[in-house]
C-alpha cells in the first residue's frame, strides 16, 4: 500500500511540480521528509492506564512504537512535576511514512463526520503542514470496543518545500483533500 503513494509521487507528482514551478533540477522538487504524530495527555500524570492505552493505540495506527514525552519543568497549576509523562510522539520516515499518509488521505480523512476537506491555511510559512484530528476512531485499525475515551492527535507533515505555495501544491498533488474557500 505504501509503494502506491511513493510510485504516484515519482511518476506523477515530480513531473507535474517540475513543470508548475519551472525547476531546473529534479532535486529542487519538494518532497515529504517525515510525518510526526503527537498526542498530548494531560491526565497521564494521574492516570497511568490512559498512557498505556495511548501507547498501544498510536502504535497500532502508525505501525511504530511511540516515545513518551515528559514534562521539562514543574507547573503547579497543572499538577505536574519535572519528568512526568505528558504525552506520546512518533516520527515516521520512508516506507512507514508513505503507508501512514496513504491510509490518512484515502481511508481516515473521508471517515470524518461532515468532512469538507482540510484547512488550506494550516501551513507554517516554510511549507510544512499540521493537521489536528479530533478522534482516533477515523482510523480503520482502531477497534471501537477497545477504546476507553475519545482522544485526538496532531499530525505534522514536514516537507523540503521552501514556501507554503510549494508545500500546498505538493500535498494537493499527493491527494490531500484541501477545503475550497
Curated annotation (Swiss-Prot):
Disulfide bridge positions per record: none
GO terms of molecular function: rRNA binding; structural constituent of ribosome; tRNA binding
Keyword Ribonucleoprotein: yes
Keyword set, alphabetical order: Ribonucleoprotein, Ribosomal protein, RNA-binding, rRNA-binding, tRNA-binding
Gene Ontology BP terms: translation
GO CC terms in record: ribonucleoprotein complex; ribosome
Subunit structure, as described in the record: Part of the 50S ribosomal subunit; part of the 5S rRNA/L5/L18/L25 subcomplex. Contacts the 5S rRNA and the P site tRNA. Forms a bridge to the 30S subunit in the 70S ribosome.
Function: This is one of the proteins that bind and probably mediate the attachment of the 5S RNA into the large ribosomal subunit, where it forms part of the central protuberance. In the 70S ribosome it contacts protein S13 of the 30S subunit (bridge B1b), connecting the 2 subunits; this bridge is implicated in subunit movement. Contacts the P site tRNA; the 5S rRNA and some of its associated proteins might help stabilize positioning of ribosome-bound tRNAs.
Family in the record: Belongs to the universal ribosomal protein uL5 family.
Protein name, per record: Large ribosomal subunit protein uL5
Organism: Thermosynechococcus vestitus (strain NIES-2133 / IAM M-273 / BP-1)
Amino acid at each position: 500500500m505504501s509503494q502506491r503513494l511513493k510510485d504516484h509521487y515519482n511518476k506523477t507528482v515530480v513531473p507535474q511540480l517540475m513543470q508548475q514551478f519551472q525547476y531546473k533540477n529534479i532535486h529542487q522538487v519538494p518532497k515529504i521528509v517525515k510525518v510526526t504524530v503527537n498526542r498530548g495527555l494531560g491526565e497521564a500524570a494521574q492516570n497511568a492506564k490512559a498512557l498505556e492505552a495511548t501507547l498501544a493505540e498510536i502504535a497500532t495506527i502508525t505501525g511504530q512504537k511511540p516515545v513518551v514525552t515528559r514534562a521539562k519543568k514543574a507547573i503547579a497549576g497543572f499538577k505536574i512535576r519535572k519528568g512526568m509523562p505528558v504525552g506520546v510522539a512518533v516520527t515516521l520516515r520512508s516506507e512507514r511514512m508513505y503507508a501512514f499518509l496513504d491510509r490518512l488521505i484515502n481511508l481516515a480523512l473521508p471517515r470524518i463526520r461532515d468532512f469538507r476537506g482540510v484547512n488550506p491555511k494550516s501551513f507554517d510559512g516554510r511549507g510544512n503542514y499540521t493537521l489536528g484530528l479530533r478522534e482516533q476512531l477515523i482510523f480503520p485499525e482502531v477497534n471501537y470496543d477497545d477504546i476507553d475515551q475519545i482522544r485526538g492527535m496532531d499530525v505534522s507533515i514536514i516537507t523540503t518545500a521552501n514556501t507554503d505555495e510549494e508545500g500546498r501544491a505538493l500535498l494537493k498533488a499527493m491527494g490531500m483533500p484541501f477545503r475550497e474557500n
